[in-house]
Amino acid sequence: MEYNVPRQSSLRMVSVIAKWYCYNVPKTFTFLNLIGDFKSWNDVSHGMLWAYNLNYMDWLLQPDMTFEQGSEWVERFITDLPTNRIGLDPYPIALRSINWIKFIGRHHKKVESNRLQRWNDSLYAQCKLLERKLEYQLLGNHLLEDAYALFIASIYFSDKKMYDKASCLLYKELDEQILPDGSHYEQSPMYHCILLDRLLDCYNASINRGHEKMCELLKLYVVRMLGHLESIVWKDDTIPLLNDSAYGIAPTVSELRAYAKRLKLEWTPLPMKECGYRKLCSTHLEAVVDVGNITATYQPGHSHADTFNYELRIDCRPFVVDTGISTYNKTARRQYERSTSAHNTVTVGNKDSSEVWGGFRMGKRAKVRVLSDTENEIMAEHDGFKGCIHQRKFTINDDVFTINDKIVGNNMTECISYIHFAPDIEVLAISSTEIRTNRANISVSGANSIEIINDFVSVEYNRLEPSKTIKIVFCRNLTYQIFQA
């Protein structure tokens, strides 16, 4: 093997973020809220994403993982690798490579030279395979993760050729994927946090090996991503669950802040612009609204047909919520969770505002034009429905959140506005002009009918909670106001 890792200088990094508890002795794993005993690295009985999580080996970095336990699993992985089809996919290689390097760094004083040599031989071979299988067919976060892994591995192995290639790819992908307002172009707050974590890892590795030019470049994007995170998070430091986002996967905002501070970074909030999201706030109300186009135009796999969707919190507690995501399996549930009716916006003729299909595919997309944008009000329109334009105005004043919808055009098809409540919201009374709940009231003008339907929301994978959804049928114009009871 052509690499150089001096025994005394395995990659030292400032303390990284510990991973979620997934492994339980002797061989039980919990991923995506699904528990299973280890059978093989290729076990897809819980779905492909579960098998991928097993092969990422994030769990080597969970707080209670001992060196002895982790070593046994690394050895087992190396032994089983010739028959491990899933583990040799490029995305698991990328994530696992970083985790192995962190694990070795954490326990470098305990790793015997013969064992380290065996681990390094396997790790280097895996990274060279990744180098040949970069995910240009998927692009997006997958290719960026590939670049992260090769960059960190190139520093660990002191491999200049790999470093030059990884640095070039990393710069190209960061320049393309991180928008000027600091957001990741796939518009998922969850993936933003995941990618920020490993970008911090890259910066961490770089500063500890004195790569000054690359350090400055990485710092630029890290600070930008931190600035966006400060702008989009709720007051309680949780993320909005927009597009493909769920809790229990990415590092928390507080963990990311603490990691950045350990790296002596400083940042300030950046105004949201290119991401398409906006924040409207008053004393008791906090709303995040979506008035953006699909920014990852060639890779919208994590995007939903959610134009003009919003989430609303009252006194930091969820009131109107996105229905979230519970699965990546190509099922009817996955199709619904990406559909327009699963979001707090309008359908015309029971159609989606953008075409979603195949679990991660998107066809024709709505095109958005922002008409006005101020601190307390934003108005935009989109052309996602055939024969008409949907205009929506969001306004927040004196703890009243107002939504005005207008359908412009010759299309007289039935329009439906959906409002999805958080699971703990109870509908106390309903009429043609008012909806009363245990936390707030909604006054409605322009409705032909209002109906309560039973629904589910998901804040974590494979966990559906019963909830109520309001379905408002209208013709051309609808206004509703949300205010505290």
Model-derived regions: residue spans:
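Aromatic-lined, polymer-binding surfaces characteristic
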Residues: 47-222
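Large, well-folded core regions of big proteins
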Residues: 40-44
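Short acidic-hydrophobic surface loop/beta-edge motif
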Residues: 29, 278-282, 310-312, 426, ...
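Carbohydrate-active enzyme catalytic cores, enriched for enzymes
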Residues: 179, 183-321, 325, 372-377
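CBM-like, beta-strand-rich accessory domains located in the C-terminal region of large
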Residues: 94, 140, 328-485
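Residues that flank catalytic or metal-binding motifs in active/ligand-binding sites
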Residues: 55, 146, 276, 306-308, ...
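Extreme N-terminal leader/anchor segments
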Residues: 1-37
